[in-house]
Amino acid sequence: MPIVDLVPGHCDALLRFFEALPEGDRTFIKEEVTDPSTVRSWAAGEDGVRRWLSMDGGDVCGYVALYRLPGWSDHVGEIRLVVAPGRRGGGLGRELARHAVVQGLGSGLAKLVVEVVAEQGAALALFTGLGFSGEALLRDHIRDRSGQLRDLMVLAHHVGETWSGMATVGVAEDLDRPEG
């Protein structure tokens, strides 16, 4: 499935995607993703965040965003990833996350971070498989919609170090080529 930039024409499909997510999944998304004005502002590019979708026909199957942090952390980007439940486990999340990593490298970011609820084993495996490692465990850091406190893990990828290592062995140019 192609990965495309989020544009205004995708707003309705993206809203349907977020509305179809189980309530438990939406608990761990920072933004109010079912608010049409939020999604429209994203598509208009008003906040400077880069966002991409994986589309199957007119339906969104996955979403990834790359937020450049402000101020003294402007060398750091935060990745936020959501994949439709029916599309999980097939490599789509990895493809989207990898796309964000490559775009982060291309925009000059030196470090990427992702926040993952500690119980989300598949997400932890996905990001560690892409070179991320644990930097922090924040105990009882988030509260789900039922009021239960959950641990949050912060994973980081020092992309500059990784990129220079890949360039040394000649595989950097293969990073964004489709596998097959």
Model regions and ranges:
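Acetyl-CoA-dependent GNAT
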Residues: 8, 20-21, 27-86, 97, ...
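Glycine-rich acetyl-CoA-binding "A-motif" of GNAT/NAT acetyltransferases
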Residues: 59-62, 122, 149
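Conserved acetyl-CoA-binding loop-helix of GNAT-fold acetyltransferases
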Residues: 89-106, 125-129
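C-terminal "cap" of GNAT-fold acetyltransferases
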Residues: 140-180
